[in-house]
Amino acid sequence: MTAQQASAPAGPLLTLQDLAVSYRARRGPRAARQIRAVDGVSFSLGTGEILALVGESGCGKTSIVRAIARLEESAGGQVLFRGADITHARGSALRQLRRDIQVVFQDPFESLDPRLTAFDTVAESLLVHKIGDGKAGRREQVLTMLEQVGLHPAETIARRYPHQLSGGQRQRLVIAGAMVLSPDLVIADEPVSMLDVSLRAGILRLMLDLREKRGVSILFVTHDLSLAWVVADRVAVVYLGRIVEIGAADEIIRAPLHPYTRALVSVIPVPETTTTRRERILLRGEAPSASRIPAGCRFHPRCPLYRQLGEPERCRTEDPALAPSGNSEHTAACHFIKESD
């Protein structure tokens, strides 16, 4: 954990209470059914904190993001922002949220208008929200923001179009368009997955710098637990629409409780200089779709511990709730946490 992470101020900015998101199946025998993509998700995000949502593709991470940002209607539960219920925000309340909560999506090229220069891309955010002291004031804000996200010389970059920028520069430009509004919360949905490995570290450092200098809270969404370890204060592991483990990032990596988290941790590369070696845990098959969620513990068909314990009936029939194992801040949804220690 970095010094910046350790000094992150406490206090709830965002709270999810039993959030549910459903979609209607579009085809096949289940076409009339509602598919529950997110099912009873609860967590909080503190002011100035970075929380990572980690899980495989299709686990519900993006559905959570879209519900928070009011890009999707939720099917149940509540989303609280600064203590106010924004679950079904409309009108002026929704317009304010569009400024206070910014989303950075994984593909920067799709997020940018190819007809706009870098300057116009960032300035558009100010114009839409009627921010800035005239044309000269907005120009100064845009150029300052471009410099702050590492796009320099700003005067030169400002005149370029998206196709004239590298992948890393495009993602920095997207971040500049978000941060120029001084949001309280930035949701970064797989922000480096489309970038070369050589560019990822720079974007991750940028996010840490923005948190330190501007006090922004970040919800960092990724399928890669090793990236979450680098940037996050806490990690929430998501599987088939549920949080199966949540706790401090260092503790999740050092002592994972849930068998699914253990499998994710087992594939994190270990530096050659360390004497510690991890045995890679292989999971059976692919995660089921949200339309075919197993009864009981939804992870049990792929769970190594379930097989190791002789396939207990409880795993097949009872849905486990998040529960602590010693540390009340580190919880996991497993009937046999003690056996997994």
Where are these regions (language model features)?
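Conserved ABC transporter NBD signature motif
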Residues: 77-85
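Charged, flexible cofactor/metal-binding loops and thiol motifs
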Residues: 9-12, 26-29, 248-341
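A short, proline-enriched helix->beta-strand linker immediately N-terminal to the Walker B motif
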Residues: 180-184
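P-loop NTP-binding/switch modules centered on Walker-like glycine-rich loops
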Residues: 56, 195, 199-278
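Conserved ABC ATPase "signature" region
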Residues: 85, 136-156, 209, 265-266
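Helix-to-loop junction immediately C-terminal to a conserved catalytic motif
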Residues: 69
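ABC ATPase NBD coupling module
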Residues: 28-32, 86-102, 128, 135, ...
